[in-house]
């Protein structure tokens, strides 16, 4: 299966039969290069990706300043050090799951709930980890 198919079929899917979808999603390499993305995934800056990569290596580095994606600031919430970063911006947010070789990113807005985004992103991330990815 191509990385684009994972984005289209597993991240941008209908969430639990509700007719709701993530706003955008992507799969990136651990160096921040985009492997596949949805049509509306924001164009981030290299320094923003460096901050996210550093947060996975040193949990808590983004909490004081927030996390930025394409200039949009997300307040960093609890996550799982080295594995998951969660952020909130207004009525929406972001979830990023790190695997052995990639980062799975999902961005959502209402009516999608934070837990729904986390479930979609982390489920794919866990699957890829099980596959040695």
Curated annotation (Swiss-Prot):
Main location per the UniProt record: cytoplasm
UniProtKB keywords: Actin-binding, Allergen, Cytoplasm, Cytoskeleton
Subcellular location: Cytoplasm, Cytoskeleton
A GO cellular component annotation in the UniProt record: cytoplasm
One Pfam family this sequence matches: Profilin
InterPro entries: PFN (IPR048278), PFN_euk (IPR005455), PFN_sf (IPR036140), Profilin_CS (IPR027310)
Single annotated GO MF: actin binding
Listed Gene3D superfamilies: Dynein light chain 2a, cytoplasmic
Entries under CDD domains matching the protein: PROF (cd00148)
Signal peptide range: none
Family membership: Belongs to the profilin family.
Record's function text: Binds to actin and affects the structure of the cytoskeleton. At high concentrations, profilin prevents the polymerization of actin, whereas it enhances it at low concentrations. By binding to PIP2, it inhibits the formation of IP3 and DG.
Subunit and partners: Occurs in many kinds of cells as a complex with monomeric actin in a 1:1 ratio.
Name recorded for this polypeptide: Profilin
UniProt organism field: Helianthus annuus
């Amino acid at each position: 299966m191509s990385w684009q198919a994972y984005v289209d079929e597993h991240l941008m899917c209908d969430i639990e039969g509700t007719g709701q979808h993530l706003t955008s999603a992507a799969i990136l390499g651990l160096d921040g290069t985009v492997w596949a993305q949805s049509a509306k995934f924001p164009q981030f800056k290299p320094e923003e990706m460096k901050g996210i990569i550093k947060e996975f290596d040193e949990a808590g580095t983004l909490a004081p300043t927030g996390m930025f994606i394409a200039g949009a600031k997300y307040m960093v919430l609890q996550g799982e050090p080295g594995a998951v970063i969660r952020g909130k911006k207004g009525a929406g947010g972001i979830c990023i799951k790190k695997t052995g070789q990639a980062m799975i990113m999902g961005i959502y807005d209402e009516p999608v709930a934070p837990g729904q985004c986390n479930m979609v992103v982390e489920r794919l991330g866990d699957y890829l980890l099980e596959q040695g990815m």
